[in-house]
UniProtKB/Swiss-Prot annotation:
This is Isoleucine--tRNA ligase. It comes from the Bacteria. Its EC number is 6.1.1.5. Its main location: cytoplasm. PROSITE patterns: AA_TRNA_LIGASE_I. Catalyzes the attachment of isoleucine to tRNA(Ile). As IleRS can inadvertently accommodate and process structurally similar amino acids such as valine, to avoid such errors it has two additional distinct tRNA(Ile)-dependent editing activities. One activity is designated as 'pretransfer' editing and involves the hydrolysis of activated Val-AMP. The other activity is designated 'posttransfer' editing and involves deacylation of mischarged Val-tRNA(Ile). Monomer. One of its GO terms (cellular component) is cytosol. It comes from Geobacter sulfurreducens (strain ATCC 51573 / DSM 12127 / PCA). A motif ('KMSKS' region) lies at residues 601-605. L-isoleucyl-5'-AMP binds at E560. GO terms for molecular function: aminoacyl-tRNA deacylase activity; ATP binding; isoleucine-tRNA ligase activity; tRNA binding; zinc ion binding.
């Protein structure tokens, strides 16, 4: 007789080979055809809402691995929230305006760019952004990210542009918006002002020079030792090109300064920097006087090569960190210089044009590019005898985020949002303390930035963006930027988009009957600057959260890379607090950057770039999702082929566990066959205890956003508790009758384990969980993504049972080692060929005797004999004290059906090759 048909072997159509690169698109197509996200949204109606607001990626180029990390993290959180019973919508967005797109379009136009009107340029920029919105949307969807992809928010949509203009109008209404001349980060290559977030720092070698400014006023009355002497203040700078713009020298009011007599002249430096100055310049001299800075206040120095004075001022910004303690002050080229000049009534002088060249009228250097002029300025200083010393310094210097070229500080007429008006700075700092920051250091980072930042420069001298909706009276030059006018224009933009600004004349854009409040005339011209793109994305709380009924403000979470403390988190905070008084988010979570396996930054030149598309083609998006979950994303996140291969192996283990469970549930109906907990075997109850521990651990990991803990918990559960122990032991139940209590008990556990496992892993392994779900008996929903996490069952926790089974597992571990030794010595082949004798001390023996009937199953051997410690000379166990283990060939014949050896085989004439247990099972 063929007994194979009487065995309960695992049967399932669930494929062993994942074949993810081919299977995932099929699952994705099914989600789209069945409108899975729409179904989820309907199911969420009436549930408590959880809003994670999507920071918009830039609609330029294909997605990179950092995008994948970000979008998958968001997707994991939102899916976990839905499975916890929340209505958790996801509205993706794109940042569509700005310099990178405009520069790319200019590049594509080539020489034709000079013939292109602003309107034509904007049309091409819009088409370019639309193209990459479509490209990136498909790439994000391919990652398994569920969302309202058919209705994303775009910062270039008419309603978004209109709301952006409306938010600007609100700042005009509350007095926060103003126009002024201030030094701002300026890219002479891109010909525009830059926001703090558009500035990157890179190492640069700059000249380091010491320059003397001859004191014009005699201070002999206050410092007699200096009477009648030629006295100069020495400044230090790494930007010689700003010397032509010098208007002052700043000293610290609380510092002591020394007069060094050297070669017939006197040089003044801070006492605390005297030695460093002398070492750097080689100047030798004696200190002939020490005095406080205040005696020099408002005294006149002569500019080194221009016929004008440089005034001595006092400033708290002067430090002893480097230089001389006498600070070169050019109000048109530095924030602190500018602030001091405002207090002291100096001009905000800037002799540099938009393209980084000195104005033609500047004596000696007119028309020169500023960085090229460094050498010429130094030569001029040498010529007039003002150069005290020179060298070079390697330092971190600001560069443009887009063209990567060094930038300058340059005073220009710009539009600003005041940090002091309406107490914006203090209100923002207060709101920061009401937000939960993950990791916690995020709070200190953004707090320091807001505390020390200048007014927000929101104007850009480009074409592709939302115009600053201000007007100028052509008669008297008065600025018209009031709430009524700007709200009127915002309404026009809502209906027809911001291109109207370029299509219509000023008179067509203004409210009827508008006249200049200053002179009463009615002829106006339009402001041609556009808004900083960080203002665009910063008002998304108004344009998206408040504008879409399924969302709401403030959002529960903003989640982006750690660079966004100075970017989107920052601009969003100011935009919201500035008009509403509250932060737009309750919690902010940040992740690090993606680096290679050695921790190096990714770079095309190094050749270590890992593209999401390549990973998906080779491994599938599921492995990318597992990679995101497996990392502690709060630091920089490593990725390499080795890491991905390791994760692919972990994925296979999880998949195979699910497949094995499915295979053993092919004839199980949970409504009919489920065995109650109190009628299960001890081993089965042990498995449910472990399942409950897993559920608690995973739930906590989701709540704390510690997905690496979740990954290790699920992987460990599948590998250790299930495959290596529980599933290994219960395999023997395949020989039981179909409806045998012990088999149904194991099936009940396997069903509960699989149901929990598949829902717990669904936010991470979204494709596989849904694939497994499709094969499950009696699933509650059509997709796992419509299901909820399993309920907690605290009654399944049994610590005393776990302690007992920990002892059994320890004994099993030692038995396995003894079996391996016997295998090496050719005493046995398979473990079922073995009979094991355990000689144990009284306490352990008594404990093991309680499980005497189960030990052969637990050890996967044919027979186990328990004897007292002194009986027989067996080798001592490696781990468990008071235990000796003997292994011998099992007596009896091998059962044809279960492969156990048994001395009673042949006792049943109908089934002479079966053991009694199998003979009973087949009858």
């Amino acid at each position: 007789m063929d007994y194979k048909s009487t065995l309960n072997l695992p049967v399932t159509d669930f494929p062993m080979k994942a074949n993810l690169p081919q299977r995932e698109p099929e699952i994705l197509a099914a989600w789209q055809q069945g409108d899975l996200y729409g179904t989820i949204a309907k199911a969420g109606k009436g549930k408590p809402r959880y809003v994670l607001h999507d920071g918009p990626p830039y609609a330029n180029g294909h997605i990179h691995i950092g995008h994948a990390l970000n979008k998958i993290l968001k997707d994991i959180i939102l899916k976990s929230k839905r499975m916890q019973g929340f209505d958790a919508p996801y509205v993706p967005g794109w940042d569509c305006h700005g310099l990178p797109i405009e520069l790319q379009v200019e590049k594509n136009l080539g020489s034709k760019k000079h013939e292109t009107t602003k309107l034509q340029m904007r049309k091409q920029c819009r088409e370019y952004a639309e193209k990459f919105v479509h490209v990136q949307r498909a790439e994000f969807e391919r990652l398994g990210v569920l969302g309202d992809w058919d209705r994303p928010y775009l910062t270039m949509s008419y309603d978004y542009e209109g709301i952006t203009a409306r938010e600007l109008a609100r700042f005009a209404e509350n007095g926060g918006l103003y126009k002024g001349k201030k030094p701002v980060h300026w890219c002479s290559s891109c010909v525009t002002a830059l926001a703090e977030a558009e500035v990157e720092y890179a190492d640069k070698t700059s000249p380091s020079i010491y320059v003397k400014f001859l004191l014009q006023d005699d201070i002999g009355g206050a410092v007699p030792a200096l009477a009648g002497k030629r006295v100069s203040l020495v400044i230090w700078t790494t930007t010689p090109w700003t010397i032509p713009a010098n208007l002052a020298v700043a000293l610290h009011p609380e510092l002591d300064y020394v007069a060094l007599e050297t070669g017939g002249e006197v040089l003044v430096v801070a006492e605390g920097l005297k030695d460093a100055f002398m070492a750097a310049t080689g100047v030798q001299g004696d200190v002939i006087a020490t005095f406080r800075a205040d005696i020099l206040y408002r005294k006149r120095c002569k500019h080194p090569f221009y016929d004008r004075d440089s005034i001595v001022l006092l400033g708290e910004h002067v430090t002893l960190d480097a230089g001389t303690g006498c600070v070169h002050t050019a109000p048109g080229h530095g924030q602190e210089d500018y602030e001091l000049a405002l207090v002291e009534g100096l001009d905000i002088y800037n002799p540099v044009d938009n393209r980084g060249r000195y104005i033609q009228s500047l004596e000696f250097f007119g028309g020169m590019f500023v960085f090229d002029a460094n050498a010429a300025v130094m030569e001029k200083l040498r010529e007039v005898g003002a150069l005290v010393g020179q060298g070079s310094v390697e330092h971190s210097y600001p560069h443009c985020w887009r063209c990567k070229k060094p930038i300058i500080f340059r005073a220009t007429e710009q539009w600003f949002i005041s940090m002091e008006k309406n107490d914006l700075r203090q209100k923002a700092l207060t709101e920061i303390d009401r937000v939960s920051w993950v990791p916690k250091w995020g709070r200190e980072r953004i707090h320091g930035m807001i505390e020390n930042r200048p007014d927000w420069c929101i104007s850009r001298q480009r074409s592709w963006g939302v115009p600053i909706t201000a007007f100028y009276c052509t008669e008297c030059g008065e600025i018209l930027a009031d709430g009524k006018t700007m709200h009127h224009v915002a309404d026009l933009f809502m209906a027809g988009g911001a291109d109207l600004w370029y299509e219509k004349e000023a008179a067509e854009l203004l409210p009827p009957g508008t006249v200049c409040p200053q002179c009463g005339k009615s002829a106006f011209e339009k402001e041609m600057d556009i808004l900083d793109v960080w203002f665009d994305s910063g008002v998304s709380h108004a344009a998206v959260l408040e504008n879409r009924p399924e969302l709401g403000s403030p959002a529960n979470m903003y989640l982006e890379g750690s660079d966004q403390h100075r970017g989107w988190f920052h601009s969003s905070l100011l935009a919201s607090v500035g008009t509403r008084g509250v932060a737009p988010y309750r919690e902010v979570l940040t992740h690090g950057f993606v680096v290679d396996g050695s921790g190096r930054k990714m770079s095309k030149s190094v050749g270590n770039v890992v593209a999401p598309e390549e990973v998906i083609k080779k491994y599938g998006a599921e492995i990318l999702r597992l990679w995101v979950a497996a990392q502690d994303y709060r630091d920089d996140v490593r990725i390499s082929q080795e890491i991905l291969t390791r994760l692919a192996e972990a994925y296979r283990r999880i998949r195979n566990t699910c497949r094995y469970l499915l295979g053993n549930l092919n004839d199980f109906d949970p409504d009919v066959d489920m065995v109650p907990y109190d009628r299960m075997t001890e081993l089965d109850r042990w498995a449910l205890h472990q399942l409950e521990v897993l559920k608690e651990k995973v739930a906590a990991a989701y709540n704390e956003y510690e997905f690496h803990i979740l990954y290790h918990a699920v992987n460990g559960f599948c590998t250790v508790e299930m495959s290596a122990f529980y599933l290994d032991i219960i395999k023997e139940r395949y020989t039981s009758r179909k409806d045998a209590p012990e088999r149904r008990s194991a099936q009940s556990v396997m069903y509960l384990v699989l149901e929990s496992l598949v829902t717990l892993m669904a936010p991470v392994l979204s494709f596989t969980a849904d694939e497994v779900w499709g094969y499950m008996p009696k699933r509650s929903e059509s997709s796992v993504h419509l299901a909820t996490f399993p309920e907690f069952r605290p009654e399944w926790k049994d610590e005393s049972l776990v302690e007992r089974w920990a002892r059994i597992m320890a004994v099993r571990g030692d038995v396995s080692k003894a079996l391996e030794q016997a295998r090496v010595q050719k005493t046995i082949g398979h473990s079922l060929d073995a009979a094991v004798t355990l000689a144990a001390e009284p306490g352990l023996l008594s404990f093991l005797q309680e499980y005497a009937g189960e030990l052969s199953t637990i050890f996967i051997v044919s027979r186990v004999d328990l004897v007292e410690e002194g009986a027989g000379d067996y080798p001592a166990a490696e781990g468990v004290s008071g235990l000796r283990i003997g292994v011998s060939a099992a007596p009896g014949e091998k059962c044809e059906r279960c492969w156990h050896y048994d001395e009673e085989i042949g006792g049943d004439s109908e089934h002479p090759t079966l053991c009694p247990k199998c003979a009973a099972a087949v009858k």
